[in-house]
A protein has these predicted regions:
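Short hydrophobic beta/alpha edge segments that flank linear recognition/processing sites
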Residues: 70-71, 107-122, 130
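Conserved beta-strand positions that form and line the central face of beta-propeller blades
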Residues: 41, 72, 89-92, 115, ...
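Acidic, glycine-rich catalytic/binding loops that coordinate metals and/or anionic ligands
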Residues: 2-14, 83-86, 99-111, 127, ...
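Sec/Tat-exported extracytoplasmic proteins
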Residues: 46, 62, 117, 150-154
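Gly/Ser-rich catalytic serine loop of serine hydrolases
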Residues: 45-49, 94-104, 117-120
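Surface-exposed, glycine-biased beta-strand/turn segments
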Residues: 1-69, 78-80, 108-109, 122
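Zn2+-dependent peptidoglycan hydrolase active-site motif and core
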Residues: 53-100, 126-132
Length: 180
């Protein structure tokens, strides 16, 4: 049975705090032998509450030597009129998230998910490094621009979902051309 679903995304921190965008490849990155930036950075003080981008589930929790403490969640977004579920990863967090969340826990969009920090060797000071893609373990899998995904659904959009696997976006019926 079809049901109506409203999809909305949220910036994890104030958009005015964006300090480095996806795909940038400035002189500092080049001097360090790094490729283009694989995420979106929000310059925030350590301990700043970070919001869940959308309603979904916790998909992965852990720590890497480079990106520090992290949590990855799934969240629906609408891209080019199509509902897609993406993975969003929050990195350089203040602490291990396994004390607060378990894989599979539901997450509500806009709620406090975690707190920013400065963990991991790649951190250049307190900030959130946000990544997005299709699969968990975003540090080693293909990524895409998180800002484009967030901004596509900042305004709530209601869609009709036929079943969990086959969402359908209802579009207004096309107007028939007037007869001459």
């Amino acid at each position: 049975m079809p049901k109506q679903v409203t999809v909305q995304t949220f910036h994890p921190a104030k958009p005015s705090r964006i300090s480095d965008k996806f795909g940038t490849h400035g002189e500092t990155r080049k001097k360090l032998g790094l490729g283009p930036h694989r995420g979106l950075d929000y310059s925030v003080q350590s301990g700043t509450p970070l919001l869940a981008i959308g309603s979904g589930r916790v998909k992965n929790i852990g720590e890497t030597s480079v990106l520090g403490y992290f949590i990855e969640i799934s969240a629906p977004v609408i891209v080019k009129g199509k509902l897609e579920v993406k993975i969003f990863g929050y990195y350089h967090l203040a602490e291990d998230q396994s004390a607060h969340w378990k894989v599979g826990d539901p997450v509500k969009g806009g709620e406090v998910l975690c707190k920013s920090g400065n963990s991991g060797s790649a951190s250049s000071g307190p900030h959130l490094h946000l990544m997005a893609g299709e699969k968990i373990n975003l540090a080693t899998n293909p990524v895409e621009d998180p800002l484009a995904l967030i901004e596509a659904t900042l305004t709530p959009q209601t869609i009709t979902v036929e079943d969990e696997e086959k969402p359908v976006v209802k579009k207004p019926a096309a107007k028939k051309p007037a007869k001459k």
